[in-house]
Amino acid sequence: MRSITSSKRVCAHCLSRSRLFSTTVQHRAQPSSNAVPSSPPRSGYARLTNRGLISITGVDSTTFLQGLITQNMLIANDPRRATRRTGTYTAFLNSQGRVLNDAFIYPMPKGDSETDTTGDPAWLVEVDKNEVSSLLKHLKKHKLRSKLKLRALEDGERTVWSSWKDHAEPRWAAYNLESESSSPFAPSSSVAGCIDTRAPGFGSRLVTPGEEDLRVHLPDEAQVAGSQVDLGTYTVRRMLHGIAEGQAEIIRESALPLECNMDMMRGVDFRKGCYVGQELTIRTHHTGVVRKRIVPVQLYANSAPQSGDTPVYDPSAAVALPPSGSNISKVDGRKGRSAGKFLGGVGNIGLALCRLEIMTDIVLTGEGSHYSPEQEFKISWSAPEEGSSSATEPGEVKVKALVPPWLRDYISSGARNLARKVDNQEGHRAKELLYQLEEEEEQRRNE
């Protein structure tokens, strides 16, 4: 078995610096494989064959991306980041503020023939491999007269990696903070990358030229530790940390960035100027309450799992995996609105979009919570309709939503800030009412 634990709580102050899903759901059967992914090692790296790359080069490439993504591309205005050549986590939204694609964006490494001759800004956009053509179409639609070139990289041109060292992560990486030291990705390096800020201590994201092993480019044990693992093992580690990735889990044109925890993951800059989809995102951040979020879930058949805040992966567990998009409901409960939606999983763990005040003990507002520790939840699904290509068998499994410590701290800090904001607003209204009553009393005296 493999579980992730956190001995330290994330500082809420540090983290603070940094329409719901459609009811029409296409059930997608989980991919079947005879090989069960192994538990992730404490140190290792994985070749991410499910990710694709798009190059954007040209004098207007930076401002072009600035108007399309949730992250701030104009790092030259920030003295702490101006000298750094690191990538960043971000998202492309549609005009309604829903996610088109989650992505990483990296400065083009030196030695690239497309940029070395011109010296113009150039970027690599990493995205779900199945979504490269869709994102490229979206970019071309917004290109207009911008002076830039767009190109999807061929397989083998560059390779995307995830690398981690659970026992030796720098404190600034473990807490989703940027190091004050110089970037490990030097301007002269052929390797692009960044600290993966989607969960504390999750590791680094790297892009290397060609198809060679990561150690060919980074032979130093201090940079890359452990052995290479397969994509399935990386997926297990990602889900244990509660990280959704790609449009199989972050549903295109349906998911909202804050429900996908992109605010906690430092994928949204709430101080930047206009970009596509900004209005709903900013309004929700400043005035709304995010009642649903993606969290890791534990799947089980009979006995409830032990209490904890992170799931435990058991490769030998005999648990049926529900189809993606399946509704979560209360066990022995009346039919009503769904408590959440299952997004995907591996073995006995997965990810789900959950209503926090129903499936967890998180309290978001002063209205109180509907959560009960004794209440169990289930996912039930029927056989696909006749003629469907899906081979999913009908079944049912119980599910428990878990909130990792870093996400709990972030949500709690937001709830406290909201409560203080409401108290301040009520205080201002009370003062205004008092002044109004005093003025009316003064007028009556003068009559």
Curated annotation (Swiss-Prot):
Entries under Pfam families matching the protein: Beta-barrel_CAF17_C
UniProt biased composition (Polar residues): 25-37
Transit peptide limits: 1-28
Intracellular or extracellular location(s): Mitochondrion matrix
Main location: mitochondrion
Organism of derivation: Aspergillus fumigatus (strain ATCC MYA-4609 / CBS 101355 / FGSC A1100 / Af293)
Superkingdom classification of source: Eukaryota
Statement: the UniProt record of this protein carries the keyword Nuclease: no
MF terms in GO: transferase activity
Family as reported in the entry's similarity comment: Belongs to the GcvT family. CAF17/IBA57 subfamily.
Protein name stated in the entry: Iron-sulfur cluster assembly factor IBA57 homolog, mitochondrial
One CC-aspect GO term: mitochondrial matrix
GO biological process, one term: iron-sulfur cluster assembly
Region (Disordered): 25-44
Keywords: Mitochondrion, Transit peptide
